[in-house]
């Protein structure tokens, strides 16, 4: 105590309330507090019952801490010293030590441990330190503002996490629900098919069984007749033998052929599981978009049907395009009336045996005038067919990327767009049960887009086939 008598009160004061300890407790990290102060400042405990130490943030359990009896006895002894007096010399604390930043008495200042330190009368020190209060208050306010911003950010992130988890669970539940529905429907369909096969096979087998039993009965009857003839006298034997053998040969020649049953059920193998997966993949696609062509955007050579789901290039000379910037004036193309801006979308286009076409999406603010530079940086994401056999992806390059040439060009194209995932995928949708991947763009779209359909020039009748938008009731060409 004699080494630093003025510091004893500070050491026995709670860092939270700045008063002498009241029922002091010492956390696992070594810091001590009034029990009530620790519970008040720490707030609600975590799931494991711990709170963060206000001084070092180490976890501690305030309810499990016992009162520090040594600190309590020291506090009780110090409390007997009059307020504002030296604990060692009991003289008034009238001098401020700048070096140790504490109040001391005259004896400590002149003879004790603070001798030779920078000392000020208490009144002068009070006046000088008061001038520092505004700056310290400002620092405190700035620190509070920074922490409040941090708290706001964390609270916002917490809300975002909750929303993200909610959306994730919803999406998982929705997709797995669709899978369960698909598999249940498939199981029911296969069960009905198995029941049909069993019924058909049962009818055929029972019919065959009845026929064979009837034939077998005839053979047994002939066996009895032969036994009876064997015992007949010579004349009667010879007369009946010829009749019996003739009848027997006729019966033998009428023997029914063996039954041939064609039981056709799927073989449960890895290929079966793969085929089921491919069918389920198609079933999980979003509902088919009911798109229609926008006649106001169509090149003058294009003819859009009244239903808005069929477009073809006319071989008649077309008038020049007008001044409407929504209309294509060079590219023989048209966009859909529907603007897509968020979520998931899936649509299909019947291309048939058309030898040249291009499909995809176009940025809403992309220019439709002049020759189109079909690359993503210009707001166009396209896949097309050239010369009736070469599929091309219009990527960011001087020339389109030629894809693997299919044995048979797709007659129907499926397009899947996900704004959240940044995916535009193209599929061969010719098989009504299976989608076969062709190509995918993987990038976040900069904004809303229109589905675009490049019909291409009719090429003197060689490319006159129309494009059809597939809907709930597909329009026939």
From Swiss-Prot:
It catalyses: S-ubiquitinyl-[E2 ubiquitin-conjugating enzyme]-L-cysteine + [acceptor protein]-L-lysine = [E2 ubiquitin-conjugating enzyme]-L-cysteine + N(6)-ubiquitinyl-[acceptor protein]-L-lysine. Changing residue 34 to A: Does not affect homooligomerization. InterPro entries: B30.2/SPRY, B30.2/SPRY_sf, Butyrophylin_SPRY, ConA-like_dom_sf, PRY, SPRY_dom, TRIM/RBCC, Znf-RING_euk. Muscle-specific. Exclusively expressed in cardiac and skeletal muscle. Zn(2+) 1 binds at residues 14, 17, 34, 37. Changing residue 207 to E: Enhances ubiquitination activity. Residues 135-232 form a coiled coil. Transmembrane segments: none annotated. Changing residue 14 to A: Does not affect homooligomerization. This is Tripartite motif-containing protein 72.
């Amino acid at each position: 105590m004699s080494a630093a008598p003025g510091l004893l009160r500070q050491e026995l004061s709670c860092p939270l309330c700045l008063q002498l300890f009241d029922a002091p407790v010492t956390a696992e990290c070594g810091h001590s507090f009034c029990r009530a102060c620790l519970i008040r400042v720490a707030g609600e405990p975590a799931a494991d019952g711990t709170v963060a130490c206000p001084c070092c943030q180490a976890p501690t359990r305030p309810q499990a801490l016992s009162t520090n009896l040594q600190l309590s006895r020291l506090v009780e002894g110090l409390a007997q010293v009059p307020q504002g007096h030296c604990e060692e010399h009991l003289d008034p604390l009238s001098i401020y030590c700048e070096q140790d930043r504490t109040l001391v008495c005259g004896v400590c200042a002149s003879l004790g441990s603070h001798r030779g330190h920078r000392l000020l009368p208490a009144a002068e020190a009070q006046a000088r330190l008061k001038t520092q209060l505004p700056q310290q208050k400002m620092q405190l306010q700035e620190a509070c503002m920074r922490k409040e911003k941090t708290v706001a950010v964390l609270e916002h992130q917490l809300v975002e996490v909750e929303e993200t988890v909610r959306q994730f669970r919803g999406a998982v539940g929705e997709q797995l629900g669709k899978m369960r529905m698909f598999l249940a429907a498939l199981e029911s369909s296969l069960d009905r098919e198995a029941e049909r096969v069993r019924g058909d096979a049962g009818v055929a087998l029972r019919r065959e069984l009845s026929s064979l039993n009837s034939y077998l009965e005839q053979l047994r009857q002939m066996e009895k007749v032969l036994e009876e003839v064997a015992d007949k006298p010579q004349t009667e034997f010879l007369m009946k033998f010829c009749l019996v053998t003739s009848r027997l040969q006729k019966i033998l020649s009428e023997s029914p052929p063996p039954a041939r049953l064609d039981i056709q059920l799927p073989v449960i193998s890895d290929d079966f599981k793969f085929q089921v997966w491919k069918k389920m993949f198609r079933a999980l696609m979003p509902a088919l978009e009911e798109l229609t062509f926008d006649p106001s955007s169509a090149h003058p050579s294009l003819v859009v049907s009244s239903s808005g789901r069929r477009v073809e290039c006319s071989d008649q000379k077309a008038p020049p395009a007008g001044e409407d910037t929504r209309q294509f004036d060079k590219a023989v193309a048209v966009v859909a009336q529907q603007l897509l801006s968020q979520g998931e979308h899936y649509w299909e286009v019947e291309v048939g045996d058309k030898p040249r076409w291009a499909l995809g999406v176009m940025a809403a603010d992309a220019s439709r005038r002049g020759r189109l530079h079909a690359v993503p940086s210009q707001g166009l994401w396209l896949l097309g067919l050239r010369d009736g056999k070469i599929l091309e992806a219009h990527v960011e390059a001087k020339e389109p990327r030629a894809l693997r040439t299919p044995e048979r060009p797709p007659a129907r194209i499926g397009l899947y767009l996900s704004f959240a995932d940044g995916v535009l995928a193209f599929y061969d949708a010719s098989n009504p049960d299976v989608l076969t991947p062709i190509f995918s763009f993987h990038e976040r779209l900069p904004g809303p887009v229109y589905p675009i359909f490049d019909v291409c020039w009719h090429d003197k009748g060689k490319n006159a086939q129309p494009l059809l938008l597939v809907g709930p009731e597909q329009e026939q060409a």
